């Protein structure tokens, strides 16, 4: 199981995988952090596709996910998911964050994708506690992979050394 999960510190926009996950906001129109970086690196076609999705379904709800092509990125697709804003833990944040991971994996599976890369969802400007978020991420992905063997590799892509150390420590308990 754990050989399907890889931990790296990289620029997620540079990865050659089937899908990178964008920690988007509900508007799907780009923003700060990884969301802004993906939109800038991928080019305007990503935003155009996001507008089309909004026309069909409206905003993307917290915990849900949608898929677009990847524009100029090396990845084939971008899965945009909306993580929860941390509000002290009393507003279903854990379940919503778990759903963001699970729904992203489900979209990848439904599109026959084999490699997917996740950023540290909700841990930036949404202020989700990093260790708590990492536990939820690892648990959600591990549970999904137990039920599905189509997805071959899941990358947890850490932006900083703090998240890298947290994930590295927690992944040891899943070996």
Swiss-Prot record:
Domain of life (superkingdom): Bacteria
Family affiliation: Belongs to the MacroD-type family.
Annotated protein name in UniProt: Macro domain-containing protein LA_4133
Pfam families, sorted: Macro
SUPFAM superfamilies: Macro domain-like (SSF52949)
Every Macro domain range: 1-175
Residue spans crossing the bilayer: none
């Amino acid at each position: 199981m754990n050989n399907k999960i890889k931990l790296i510190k990289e620029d997620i926009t540079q990865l050659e995988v089937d899908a990178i996950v964008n920690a988007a906001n509900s508007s799907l129109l780009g923003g700060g952090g990884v969301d802004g970086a993906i939109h800038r690196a991928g080019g305007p076609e990503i935003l155009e596709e996001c507008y089309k999705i909004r026309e069909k379904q409206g905003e993307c709800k917290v915990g849900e996910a949608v898929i677009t092509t990847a524009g100029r990125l090396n990845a084939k697709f971008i899965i945009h998911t909306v993580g929860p804003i941390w509000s002290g833990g009393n507003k279903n944040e854990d379940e919503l964050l778990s759903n963001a991971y699970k729904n992203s994996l489900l979209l990848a599976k439904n599109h026959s994708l084999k490699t997917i890369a996740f950023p540290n969802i909700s841990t930036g400007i949404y202020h989700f506690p990093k260790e708590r978020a990492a536990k939820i991420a690892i648990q959600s992905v591990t549970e999904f992979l137990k039920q599905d063997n189509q997805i071959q590799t899941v990358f947890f892509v850490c932006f900083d050394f703090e998240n890298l150390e947290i994930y590295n420590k927690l992944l040891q308990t899943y070996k």
